[in-house]
Swiss-Prot record:
Part of the 30S ribosomal subunit. Forms a loose heterodimer with protein S19. Forms two bridges to the 50S subunit in the 70S ribosome. Located at the top of the head of the 30S subunit, it contacts several helices of the 16S rRNA. In the 70S ribosome it contacts the 23S rRNA (bridge B1a) and protein L5 of the 50S subunit (bridge B1b), connecting the 2 subunits; these bridges are implicated in subunit movement. Contacts the tRNAs in the A and P-sites. The keyword Thylakoid does not apply. SUPFAM superfamilies: S13-like H2TH domain. It holds the Pfam family Ribosomal_S13. Keywords: Ribonucleoprotein, Ribosomal protein, RNA-binding, rRNA-binding, tRNA-binding. It comes from Saccharopolyspora erythraea (strain ATCC 11635 / DSM 40517 / JCM 4748 / NBRC 13426 / NCIMB 8594 / NRRL 2338). NCBIfam families: uS13_bact. HAMAP family: Ribosomal_uS13. Residues 92-125 are annotated as: Disordered. One of its GO terms (biological process) is translation. Belongs to the universal ribosomal protein uS13 family. GO terms for molecular function: rRNA binding; structural constituent of ribosome; tRNA binding. This is Small ribosomal subunit protein uS13.
Length: 125
């Protein structure tokens, strides 16, 4: 099993896809890394030899990945909250940050609906 950046890559997937299992690497960056290391997109992680794995590890050192990237993102969010900018306020209130509508939708960010009782009808006497 190939292990890169602390992540076990799936053995049967194409290398182009397998690299995307690492947090911080998407399809574009995966292709970029494979081109730089002269490794085929179609090779499977189980078929990589030690030289190719060493090249990949060396190439991955140039990027912030996994825990470092997660910490950096969290630090950026904390900084925005502390300085009190608009994005920080939206994070603090658990609302969408990038200008999306909130009258309807935004349920992922806001959580489940909080049901509010309607006005009761007056009974006849």
């Amino acid at each position: 099993m190939a292990r890169l950046a602390g992540v076990d890559l799936p053995r049967e997937k194409r290398m182009e896809i397998a690299l995307t299992y690492i947090y911080g690497i998407g399809r574009t960056r995966s292709k970029e890394i494979l081109r730089a290391t002269d490794i085929s997109f179609d090779v499977r992680p189980k078929d990589l030899d030690d030289d190719q794995l060493a090249k990949l590890r060396e190439a991955l050192e140039n990027y912030r990945l996994e825990g470092d990237l997660r910490r950096e993102v969290q630090a950026d969010i904390r900084r925005k909250i502390e300085i009190g900018c608009y994005q920080g306020l939206r994070h603090r209130r658990h609302l969408p940050v990038h200008g999306q509508r909130t009258k309807t939708n935004a349920r992922t960010r806001k959580g489940p609906k909080k049901t509010v009782a309607g006005k009761k009808k007056a009974g006849k006497k």
